[in-house]
Amino acid sequence: MSCWRKAWRGEGRGRGVRSLRTFVPVNTSTDMTKDQSLRREGEHLLDEIKNLGKELLEESNEPRLLPAIYSRRSIRKFVDTPLTGEEVQILLEAGLRAPSSKNKHTTQFILIEQREMLDRLSHMRESGALFLQQVPLGIVILGSPMECERWIADASLAAGYIQLQAEALGLGSCWADAYGCYTGNGQESSEYVRNLLGIPYQLEVFCILAIGHKASDAAPRPTESLKWEKIHIERYPELEETEAPKE
């Protein structure tokens, strides 16, 4: 039995965690196929997963996740305090250490601190990027489609790592998409940013991260409010008859 299954069944957990409720055994009689058995077991395991996080928090009052993962929220209001050089260096190192397809590391970054340029970049989309007007630092994330066909995944991972590192430093962040978006005049957002910053055409503008000191904190999402129903075990559940596609 795999370790994660043991953990959700109540075996092999760390000290101080109380026992989960009794795992309901699966009916493996001859009239049940292997797939049905796996689905039944998966349903019971999912019930355990849904309650595990809440039970652990009630027991210890401390999140089991890394604090930055547990507490990170998108922040759109910042105070006008510049980041230190050390903070910026740590953020960039986090981005450079992100996983990369075939270890190519083709993602590039442009740091923007000039207020006038941040104001202009805030109009790269019809809506949803105005928070760039008040942020002390913007990081433009660039991908290289010619060098790496998985550039979108690489750029996404780099941006996510920077956001988590920002949270770990007590900073706030928010992601503003550029790739696949448009300005209010119908121009591609990536083209708009490219023209402003002189970005060569072999690079693609993926997003801009707003990084700064938070004007206020947002509370972490309660564990029970997470969409645990999006998790499935072994295979996707069968559709209900009402959900069956029309022929």
Model regions and ranges:
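Short, flexible coil/linker elements and helix-boundary hinge sites characteristic
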Residues: 9-10, 198
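Acidic, surface-exposed loops and disordered segments
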Residues: 16, 23-247
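Residue-identity detector for glycine
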Residues: 10-16
